[in-house]
C-alpha cells in the first residue's frame, strides 16, 4: 500500500502559500495572528 502523503511543492504553495493567504480577508487574519504570536515562518 502506498503512503497517503505524496508531497508536491506547487500544491503546497497554492494551498498554503503566502500569496494565497494574502488573497482573502480570512487569510490575512491568519497572517496577522501568526505575526502577533511571533511566528518566524508566516506561511508555507
UniProtKB/Swiss-Prot annotation:
Region (Disordered) location: 1-25
Give the Gene Ontology MF terms in alphabetical order.
structural constituent of ribosome
Q: Does the keyword Ribonucleoprotein apply?
A: yes
Compositional bias annotation for Basic residues: 1-22
The record's InterPro entries line, in alphabetical order, gives: Ribosomal_bL34
Report which superkingdom the organism of origin falls in: Bacteria
Write one Pfam family the protein is assigned to: Ribosomal_L34
Q: Which UniProt keywords apply?
A: Ribonucleoprotein, Ribosomal protein
Keyword match Oxidoreductase: no
Q: Tell me which stretches of the chain form a coiled coil.
A: none
The chain's disulfide connectivity reads none
Q: What do the Gene Ontology cellular component annotations say?
A: ribonucleoprotein complex; ribosome
Biological process GO annotation list?
Answer: translation
Task: Tell me its family.
Answer: Belongs to the bacterial ribosomal protein bL34 family.
Q: What is this protein called?
A: Large ribosomal subunit protein bL34
**Its gene?**
rpmH
Amino acid at each position: 500500500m502506498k503512503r497517503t502523503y505524496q508531497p508536491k511543492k506547487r500544491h503546497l504553495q497554492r494551498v498554503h502559500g503566502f500569496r494565497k493567504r494574502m488573497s482573502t480577508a480570512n487569510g490575512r487574519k491568519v497572517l496577522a495572528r501568526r505575526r502577533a504570536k511571533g511566528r518566524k515562518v508566516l506561511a508555507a
